[in-house]
């Protein structure tokens, strides 16, 4: 697989290092963090669930997001 060398600041390196999981390369980290995330509005009007069920789904999604971002 071809590679490319890049220069990043020490701060950027430290942040990337904090995101790195066991057994993961820095390339893996960059790919994982830059994967396209779907916008919730993309799903607007497509759910047939009740408002309460949708609210529950959104809250669970936020908890999952916080768990990954704040840990």
UniProtKB/Swiss-Prot annotation:
Return the InterPro entries for the record: Put_antitoxin
Q: Which residues form the signal peptide?
A: none
Sorted UniProt keywords: Toxin-antitoxin system
Q: Does the keyword Glycoprotein apply?
A: no
Q: What HAMAP family does the record tag this protein with?
A: UPF0330
Q: Which Pfam families match?
A: VAPB_antitox
Membrane-spanning parts: none
Q: What is this protein called?
A: Putative antitoxin VapB15
Q: What does this protein do?
A: Possibly the antitoxin component of a type II toxin-antitoxin (TA) system. Its cognate toxin is VapC15 (Potential).
Which family is it part of? Answer: Belongs to the UPF0330 family.
